[in-house]
Amino acid sequence: MQVDDVLLSRLEKLSFLKISEDKREEIVSQLSEIVNFVENLSLLDTQNVDEKFAMSNDSTFLREDTAFCDTSINESILKNAPLSSDNFFVVPKIIE
C-alpha cells in the first residue's frame, strides 16, 4: 500500500483530525514505515506454527479483584463539578 498525501487527507477526513502542513511529510513517512512493517509480517511463513504457540509455558497469573476507592480523590474531582450527587457527576438529561 502506498502512503501518500492523498491517503493522508482521506485518513484525516475519516478521523476528524487536522494535520498541520509542517507535520504532513513526517506523518506520511511514519505511516509508510508502519505499513512496510505490517507487510513484512504478512510475508512470514506461519504454516507450521501451532495456533496455540506461546513463547512461555507459564500460564497467565490472575490476580484477585479488589475494589479500592480513595475518597479523597473523588472529593477533589467532584468539588470542581457544577453539580454532583452520591459521588457522581450530575449532567443535564439529553435523551427523552
Curated annotation (Swiss-Prot):
Gene Ontology terms for molecular function: asparaginyl-tRNA synthase (glutamine-hydrolyzing) activity; ATP binding; glutaminyl-tRNA synthase (glutamine-hydrolyzing) activity
Assembly? Heterotrimer of A, B and C subunits.
- Write out the entry's keywords from A to Z: ATP-binding, Ligase, Nucleotide-binding, Protein biosynthesis
Q: Its encoding gene is what? A: gatC
Q: Which family does it belong to?
A: Belongs to the GatC family.
SUPFAM superfamilies referenced in this protein's UniProt entry, alphabetically: Glu-tRNAGln amidotransferase C subunit
Instruction: Provide the E.C. number(s) assigned to this enzyme.
Output: 6.3.5.-
The free-text function statement in the UniProt record for this protein reads: Allows the formation of correctly charged Asn-tRNA(Asn) or Gln-tRNA(Gln) through the transamidation of misacylated Asp-tRNA(Asn) or Glu-tRNA(Gln) in organisms which lack either or both of asparaginyl-tRNA or glutaminyl-tRNA synthetases. The reaction takes place in the presence of glutamine and ATP through an activated phospho-Asp-tRNA(Asn) or phospho-Glu-tRNA(Gln).
* Keyword Ligase recorded: yes
The record ties this protein, via Gene3D superfamilies, to: Glu-tRNAGln amidotransferase C subunit, N-terminal domain
Database matches in InterPro entries: Asp/Glu-ADT_sf_sub_c, GatC
Species for this entry? Sulfurimonas denitrificans (strain ATCC 33889 / DSM 1251)
Query: Alphabetically, which GO biological process terms does the record hold?
Result: glutaminyl-tRNAGln biosynthesis via transamidation; regulation of translational fidelity; translation
What is the name of this protein?
A: Aspartyl/glutamyl-tRNA(Asn/Gln) amidotransferase subunit C
Q: Which reaction does it catalyse?
A: L-glutamyl-tRNA(Gln) + L-glutamine + ATP + H2O = L-glutaminyl-tRNA(Gln) + L-glutamate + ADP + phosphate + H(+); L-aspartyl-tRNA(Asn) + L-glutamine + ATP + H2O = L-asparaginyl-tRNA(Asn) + L-glutamate + ADP + phosphate + 2 H(+)
Pfam families in the record, alphabetically?
GatC (PF02686)
